């Protein structure tokens, strides 16, 4: 009977690392596309600008947080990013706080 199990070698570890990096790169590309194609000019500029400036340094956890933010409705995001409404505490993830602050700076506020 042949053994179907093989020991992990350094090359398999680096290969797994390469796959993980490829996965992060693909997520970053999708995130950039989604952030720049929201449907309204204002959100494309604010959200797209933030993502373009920050996505390449985001961790996997930060990418997940940003992906979840992009699931939120544009009217809510726009109100928070333009400072028309305060950011509700239950929605205030570290990433969304960064976005609100970035938006405030970009708007010169």
Curated annotation (Swiss-Prot):
InterPro entries linked to this entry: SDH, SDH_sf
Cell location: Cytoplasm
GO biological processes: tricarboxylic acid cycle
Superkingdom, taxonomy of origin: Bacteria
Taxonomic lineage: Bacteria, Pseudomonadati, Pseudomonadota, Alphaproteobacteria, Acetobacterales
Compositionally biased tracts (Low complexity): 7-17
This protein's UniProt keywords: Chaperone, Cytoplasm
Name the record gives this protein: FAD assembly factor SdhE
Region (Disordered): 1-22
Broad class of the protein's primary localization: cytoplasm
Cross-referenced Gene3D superfamilies: Flavinator of succinate dehydrogenase
Gene from which this protein is expressed: sdhE
Keyword Chaperone recorded: yes
Pfam families reported in the protein's UniProt record: Sdh5 (PF03937)
Any one GO CC term of the record: cytoplasm
Functional summary from the UniProt entry: An FAD assembly protein, which accelerates covalent attachment of the cofactor into other proteins. Plays an essential role in the assembly of succinate dehydrogenase (SDH, respiratory complex II), an enzyme complex that is a component of both the tricarboxylic acid cycle and the electron transport chain, and which couples the oxidation of succinate to fumarate with the reduction of ubiquinone (coenzyme Q) to ubiquinol. Required for flavinylation of SdhA, when the SDH operon and this gene are overexpressed in G.oxydans. Flavinylation of SdhA is detected only in the presence of sdhE.
PANTHER family: PROTEIN EMI5 HOMOLOG, MITOCHONDRIAL, SUCCINATE DEHYDROGENASE ASSEMBLY FACTOR 2, MITOCHONDRIAL
């Amino acid at each position: 009977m042949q053994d179907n199990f093989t020991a992990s070698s350094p090359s398999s570890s680096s290969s797994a690392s390469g796959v993980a990096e490829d996965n992060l790169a693909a997520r970053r590309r999708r995130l950039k596309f989604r952030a720049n194609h929201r449907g309204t000019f204002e959100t494309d500029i604010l959200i797209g600008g933030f993502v373009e400036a920050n996505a390449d340094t985001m961790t996997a956890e930060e990418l997940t947080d940003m992906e979840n933010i992009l699931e939120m409705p544009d009217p809510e995001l726009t109100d928070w990013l333009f400072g028309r409404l305060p950011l509700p505490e239950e929605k205030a993830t570290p990433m969304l706080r960064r976005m609100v602050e970035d938006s405030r700076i970009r708007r010169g506020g």
